[in-house]
Each structure stands twice: as structure tokens, then as C-alpha cells.
């Protein structure tokens, strides 16, 4: 699967997924980028009913704890499609910045400390210990909730145009706007489904 690349107009999933999309009553996209990446391969979906509903992230779980912050953090950026090459380049360019990578990864620069796993209940505190959250994927990401979590936790986000969360205008309007967007996402999802099935 190569979203938004010419070779994906005929890639193997397209033949399986096209009828599923076409038969659906409603498509729920996690961001405008999520929708655009699929319309690239399935332009006929332009006319299909859809709703934009971001991933549910609880602002009660992610907030600024006013801790001392230092360096950068990334989650799963050691995975190729999540942007390992770009992440490593960023770390090399910022060799004096200590970087914490949560998740898999190998052959990392010396300024990167890797942690295999952080409990969900400890993620907010982990974000709060860092100034910057780095996420530079190579494929369009439907949303990437870690971006929203880190942003709500007070991190400055270093992203790129392939991060679905950042395609929401609220991310350029400030944390309060993002908080309002996300705290209603679970309800919006169920409201959209109820409208379709009723």
C-alpha cells in the first residue's frame, strides 16, 4: 500500500477495498488528510457520504503538568513507515538534544535513548518531561493520536504534512481548540453511526 503515490492507483488493496467503500452508507475519516489520501486512489468516493471524526483522545488524560522539560520525545518513530529515516536525520541534525524514543528501533544516533514501552497511564507524565514531540512519517497517517496527546500535554510538535492530526485547523488555533475538538469526538462518532442506521 503506497497512499498518495501513483503506483497505489492499482496496488493490491485497492481491488479489495473499493467495493467495501462503495457499498458503505457512510465513511468516517479521521482527518481531511485521511480522506484525501484515499480519494487519490478512489476518486469516485468524492461524492460518497462521509463524516470527519478525529481519534478520541481524552483531554482529561493529557494536559500540562508544569514539570521541568528537556529534549525531545517520539513514539514509534523507529518504524520505517512512521518515518525512521527522517527521525534519525532530525536526531543527527539536533545531536545536542537528548531524544527519548518510545517503541521499536535500532541503529539510532547516540543522543537517542530507546524505551520499549510506556504504560498508557504514564504517557502524559512522559510527554511532560520533554519540550518537543517529533513525528515525521513517510506515508500519510490517518490521525496519529500520539501527536494530539503530546500537544495537549504541552509539547511543541515537529511534524510534517503527512500527519493527519495536523490537517485539522484546530491544531493551528491552539490547545484549547484542540481540546474542544477531541473531547467531543467519541460522541460525534456514535451520533454519525446512529444517524446512518436509523
What are these regions (language model features)?
Residues 2-27, 128:
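Membrane-proximal helix-turn-helix segments that form the acceptor-binding/catalytic region
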Residues 22-63:
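Donor nucleotide-sugar binding/catalytic pocket of nucleotide-sugar-dependent glycosyltransferases
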Amino acid at each position: 500500500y503506497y497512499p498518495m503515490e501513483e503506483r497505489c492507483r492499482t496496488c493490491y488493496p485497492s481491488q479489495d477495498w473499493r467495493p467495501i467503500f462503495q457499498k458503505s452508507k457512510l465513511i468516517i475519516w479521521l482527518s481531511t488528510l485521511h480522506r484525501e489520501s484515499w480519494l487519490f486512489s478512489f476518486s469516485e468516493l468524492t461524492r460518497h457520504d462521509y463524516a470527519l471524526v478525529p481519534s478520541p483522545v481524552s483531554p482529561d488524560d493529557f494536559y500540562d503538568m508544569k514539570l521541568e522539560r528537556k529534549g525531545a520525545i517520539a513514539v514509534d518513530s523507529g518504524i520505517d513507515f512512521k518515518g525512521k529515516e527522517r527521525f534519525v536525520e532530525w536526531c543527527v541534525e539536533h545531536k545536542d538534544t537528548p531524544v527519548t524514543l518510545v517503541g521499536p528501533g535500532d541503529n539510532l544516533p547516540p543522543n537517542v535513548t530507546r524505551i520499549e514501552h510506556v504504560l498508557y497511564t504514564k504517557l502524559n507524565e512522559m510527554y511532560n518531561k520533554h519540550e518537543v514531540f517529533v513525528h515525521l512519517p513517510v506515508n500519510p497517517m490517518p490521525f496519529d493520536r500520539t501527536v494530539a496527546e503530546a500537544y495537549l500535554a504541552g509539547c511543541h510538535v515537529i511534524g510534517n504534512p503527512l500527519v493527519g492530526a495536523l490537517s485539522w485547523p484546530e491544531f493551528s488555533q491552539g490547545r484549547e481548540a484542540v481540546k474542544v475538538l477531541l473531547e467531543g469526538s467519541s460522541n460525534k462518532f456514535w451520533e454519525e453511526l446512529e444517524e446512518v442506521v436509523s
